[in-house]
Design a protein with these regions (language model features):
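Signature of alpha-helical transmembrane segments in polytopic membrane proteins
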Residues: 1-138, 274, 462
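A hydrophobic, helix-centered structural microdomain
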Residues: 269-332, 369, 446-462
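Membrane-cytosol interface motif
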Residues: 84-88, 139-158, 306-329, 351
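C-terminal terminal-structure detector
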Residues: 386, 393-462
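N-terminal hydrophobic signal-anchor/signal peptide
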Residues: 1-23, 27, 74-76, 125-287, ...
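A short, structured surface patch at a secondary-structure boundary
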Residues: 342-405, 447-455
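Membrane-spanning helices that line or support transport/gating and their immediate boundary helices
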Residues: 33, 128, 132-136, 158, ...
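Short, glycine-rich, amphipathic interfacial segments at transmembrane boundaries or analogous
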Residues: 179-181, 238-242, 247-251, 309-348, ...
Length: 462
C-alpha cells in the first residue's frame, strides 16, 4: 500500500491505473498513424493531445465508476471482458455528451471506432499481465503478528479476506505469556531467540502488534525496537485497520491515537480547497441532474404536495440546520411523533420515493445546503438530533464526526450498507473517523467516483 495525501491506496491498483492511462493515451496516436498511414486525409480533431487526454481520462473515470480498480486481482479473460464492455459503453456516452459541447474534441467516426478498439484491447492485455504479476509471492505483504488475542483474530480475518489488488500472507502469531488465544492453533508460533531473528527467518515484511495491554511486563518493547532498527516495519492494530479497511476501529482505539496520530487537517488552505470543491461539484451535479429533479414532480401525482421535505439535522460543531430533500415517504410517516430509522422495505416509503432513494435523487436538493455553507459535498452524513443524543451517549468519540461539515455523500455511504441501528452507527462511525482524520481533495475525488458506482448499482438504499 502507498499513502497519497494521507489516504492508503493499493500499489498494484495505482500502477495499473497509470499503465492503462498511458496505454489509452497512446491508443489515439496509434490509431491516427494507422488510419492515415497512406499519407492521405487529415486529423479532424483540432488538438490531438487534448482529444487523446480527454478520451483517456473519461475511460479511466468510467472504469473507476464501475469498480474496475476495486475488485479481485485474479480475474480471468472472460470476467475482464465482461467488466470492460460496460465501462467503455459508459465512456462512449460521456464522450458523446462532451463532444456535443466541444465539437473540436471529435476524432471522426471511423478513427473513433479504431481508437476504442485499440484502447479496449490494450486494457484487456494490460490487465491480464498485471493480474498475472499480482499472483507473484514477491508482491505479497508478509505479516507477522505479535499477540494472539481477539484483536489478532480480527486483524488476521481482515488480512485473509482482503480482496482487490493488495494481497497479504499471514505468517503467524506470536502470543505473549499468559495471553488468552483466539486464533487458530495452526497460526501460533513459539517465540524464538528474538523477534528480529524470527522476522528474518520467515521473511516478514511487517510486524503487526495486536496486544491490548502494552503496560504488561511481558510486552516486548526492546525487541520491537530492535526490529524497527533492523529494517522491519512495526505497526499497531489501529494503524493496520486504518490502512487495510479505511477505518479507525473502536475496539483498538486509544485516545492518544486520535491526538498524536496525525491528520485532522483544518488549515485555511484545506478549508478553501474544500469549499471550492463543494461549489464546483455541487454546481456541476445540479446542472447535470436538472432532468432528474424535474422527474421528482411525480411525487405530486402519487401523493400530492409537498414535494420537498425539510428536517432538522446536526451539523458542524453540533449546530442545528434544516436539510432539504425530496419527500420520499408518506406525509404521515411519523404520526406517532417519535423519530424512527428507515428499515428494509419500509412501508412508509412511496413507490416514487423508492425509485428516488435507489438512484439517490431524493438527496439532490441538499445542493442548496452546500451552497449555503451548511454542508459539504463529501463528509459524514448529518443525523437527527434525537439520534445524535442517543448515539453520543452509547458510542465513545461519536461527537468527533461533527468536527467537520456533514456531506451529501461520504466514505461510510460508499463503503457500508444503509444503517438503521446502533451497531450500524458504530460501523459507519469508524469510516467517518477515518475521513475526519484523513480528509483531502484527493479522498473527496475518490469518494465522488465511488458514489457514481453506488448510484449506478443501487447499493445501500432503503
Amino acid at each position: 500500500m502507498i499513502r497519497i495525501f494521507n489516504h492508503y491506496v493499493s500499489k498494484m491498483a495505482f500502477i495499473l491505473l497509470l499503465l492503462e492511462l498511458l496505454m489509452l493515451l497512446a491508443s489515439a496516436s496509434v490509431a491516427s498513424a494507422l488510419w492515415f498511414s497512406d499519407g492521405h486525409g487529415h486529423f479532424r480533431a483540432d488538438n490531438l493531445y487534448l482529444s487523446s487526454l480527454t478520451f483517456a481520462l473519461v475511460i479511466i473515470f468510467s472504469m473507476s465508476a464501475l469498480g474496475m480498480y476495486q475488485h479481485s486481482s485474479r480475474e480471468g479473460l472472460r470476467t475482464t471482458l465482461i467488466r470492460i464492455m460496460p465501462s467503455f459503453a459508459l465512456g462512449f456516452a460521456l464522450l458523446s455528451a462532451l463532444i456535443a459541447v466541444r465539437p473540436d474534441l471529435y476524432f471522426g467516426r471511423g478513427i473513433s471506432i479504431l481508437i476504442f478498439a485499440i484502447g479496449a484491447t490494450g486494457v484487456v492485455i494490460t490487465r491480464l499481465v498485471v493480474f498475472k504479476s499480482a499472483e507473484s509471492a514477491l508482491l505479497e505483504a508478509r505479516l507477522l503478528f505479535v499477540g494472539g488475542g481477539a484483536l489478532a483474530h480480527e486483524c488476521i480475518e481482515l488480512a485473509s479476506n482482503k480482496y482487490g489488488f493488495h494481497q497479504s500472507h499471514v505468517i503467524g502469531c506470536i502470543p505473549l505469556p499468559g495471553e488468552e488465544y483466539c486464533v487458530p492453533d495452526a497460526l501460533l508460533l513459539p517465540m524464538g531467540e528474538s523477534l528480529l531473528a524470527m522476522a528474518r527467518k520467515y521473511e516478514a515484511s511487517e510486524i503487526v502488534v495486536t496486544v491490548a495491554n502494552r503496560r504488561s511486563a511481558a510486552f516486548p518493547v526492546r525487541q520491537l525496537l530492535e526490529c524497527a532498527l533492523g529494517g522491519v516495519r512495526v505497526i499497531d492494530a489501529a494503524t493496520f485497520f486504518e490502512r487495510e479497511a479505511c477505518q479507525i476501529r473502536m475496539d483498538s482505539l486509544q485516545p492518544s491515537y486520535l491526538i498524536f496520530g496525525g491528520g485532522f487537517d483544518q488549515s485555511f488552505i484545506r478549508a478553501a480547497t474544500k469549499r471550492t470543491f463543494d461549489l464546483v461539484a455541487s454546481g456541476l451535479i445540479t446542472l447535470l441532474t436538472v432532468p432528474a429533479m424535474l422527474a421528482a414532480a411525480a411525487i405530486l401525482l402519487e401523493d400530492g404536495a409537498p414535494v420537498f421535505y425539510r428536517q432538522e439535522r446536526v451539523g458542524r460543531d453540533g449546530r442545528i440546520f434544516k436539510v432539504l430533500k425530496f419527500r420520499s415517504m408518506r406525509k404521515d410517516a411519523e404520526r406517532a411523533g417519535t423519530p424512527t430509522w428507515a428499515s428494509q422495505n419500509d412501508p412508509r416509503i412511496t413507490r416514487v420515493g423508492r425509485i428516488m432513494r435507489k438512484l439517490r435523487i431524493d438527496e439532490l436538493p441538499q445542493m442548496v445546503n452546500v451552497f449555503k455553507g451548511e454542508m459539504s459535498f463529501v463528509g459524514p452524513r448529518p443525523e437527527r438530533d434525537f439520534f445524535v443524543r442517543q448515539l453520543e451517549r452509547d458510542i465513545p468519540y461519536y461527537g468527533v464526526r461533527h468536527g467537520i461539515k456533514p456531506g451529501i455523500t461520504g466514505l461510510a455511504q460508499v463503503r457500508y450498507k444503509y444503517g438503521a441501528s446502533v451497531e450500524d452507527a458504530i460501523e459507519k462511525l469508524q469510516y467517518d473517523l477515518y475521513y475526519v482524520k484523513n480528509n483531502s481533495l484527493f479522498l473527496d475525488l475518490l469518494i465522488l467516483v465511488d458514489t457514481v458506482q453506488v448510484v449506478l448499482s443501487g447499493k445501500g438504499s432503503r
